[in-house]
Amino acid sequence: MSDKQKQLMEYATQDLVAMLVERQGLTLEDAMQRVYHSQLYTKLLDQETGLYLEGSEYLYGLLAEESAVV
């Protein structure tokens, strides 16, 4: 995995955490837990899925769908 791919994954993760804090009023710790324990995060780190190339809004939508199912 290239440094650029790792950086994109990190940025996407940071964006998701920030969006959860801003939109759902979660604490930073709760938002981080939600992201890091999600199926989306596992897929985001898998370079084969290419999810790290998607926009933050799209990823947030996927995370919201995942949370709604649980």
Tell where the protein language model's regions lie, with residue ranges.
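C-terminal alpha-helical interaction appendages
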Residues: 1-70
